[in-house]
């Protein structure tokens, strides 16, 4: 029997929680800096970070936000994130188990909500956005970052296969146009968008998900045998037949819940 999407998420991230806490790509970069700059300008006093993973976004926002609540579906991830935040001297973030589709908060409880590099794991985006809109104050800010989906079908199919082979809990990466459509439908306005690139060192990126040697070898073969335009589109670097790195594009969106 195939595991449900959420069970798959818990299995994958439960086994790799420590690696996510240590991941340099999650700990910082121009993407997190942009979210933080947007966040500072909101002046929100209560922030919810959904799908907090290793807790890096929650930690960054706690430097200037009095109340930060961080939620995630995966219990070991929350334990690792809590220990990480405490180790950084930040003991005020409240970590809580919660599915994004059933957030255990009253309506209009937060001035800002963040969701960074996680929505590609959600079974569906509209129910998640409905919850985000519900827990935000009217006029409140939603800061989203996720892997940007490609508009070109061949390139989109190629990178989806790469992602799913590495992590079967990856569902899809939406295009910019699709995100804008979903956000507007959920009642968000005043959208501001940015795209930044993020380097993915191959050994670290594949290693973090603890692939078997066979699955990793098959993934390498899939990439190396793909049409050259696929590798070029994601700036794959290959030296002496070995994949070294590639580049993801990240979509960042600032949106406001309408009054
Ligand atoms: C890559 S990590 C997130 C990284 C983190 N936000 C950061 O800024 O470093 C993805 C996280 O999404 C969580 N997740 C996936 N599906 C979820 C869901 N339906 N509800 C809540 N969390 C979910 C996983 O458990 C995992 O911890």
Predicted regions and their residues:
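Class I SAM-dependent methyltransferase SAM/SAH-binding core
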Residues: 48-102
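A short SAM/SAH-binding and catalytic strip from SAM-dependent methyltransferases
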Residues: 111-124
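Short alpha-helix
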Residues: 172-186
């Amino acid at each position: 029997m195939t595991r449900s999407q959420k069970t798959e998420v818990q299995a994958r991230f439960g086994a790799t929680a420590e690696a996510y806490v240590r991941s340099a790509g999650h700990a910082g970069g121009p993407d997190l800096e942009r979210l933080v700059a947007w966040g500072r300008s909101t002046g929100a006093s209560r922030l919810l970070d959904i799908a907090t993973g290793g807790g890096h976004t929650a930690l960054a926002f706690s430097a200037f936000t009095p109340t930060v609540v961080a939620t995630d579906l995966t219990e070991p991830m929350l334990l690792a994130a809590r220990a990480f935040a405490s180790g950084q001297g930040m003991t005020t973030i409240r970590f809580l188990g919660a599915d994004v589709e059933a957030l255990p908060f009253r309506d209009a409880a937060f001035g800002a909500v963040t969701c960074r590099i996680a929505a590609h794991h959600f079974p569906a985006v509209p129910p998640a956005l409905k919850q985000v809109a519900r827990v935000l104050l009217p006029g409140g800010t939603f800061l989203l970052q996720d892997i940007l989906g490609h508009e070109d079908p061949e390139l989109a199919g190629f990178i989806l296969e790469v992602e799913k082979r590495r992590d079967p809990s990856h569902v899809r990466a939406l295009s910019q146009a699709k995100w804008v459509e979903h956000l507007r439908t959920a009642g968000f306005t005043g959208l501001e968008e940015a795209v930044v690139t993020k380097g993915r060192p191959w050994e670290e990126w594949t290693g973090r998900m603890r692939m078997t040697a066979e699955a990793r070898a098959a993934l390498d073969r899939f990439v190396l045998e793909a049409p050259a335009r696929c590798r070029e589109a994601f700036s794959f670097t290959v030296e002496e037949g070995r994949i070294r790195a590639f580049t993801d594009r990240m979509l960042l969106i600032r949106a406001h819940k309408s009054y």
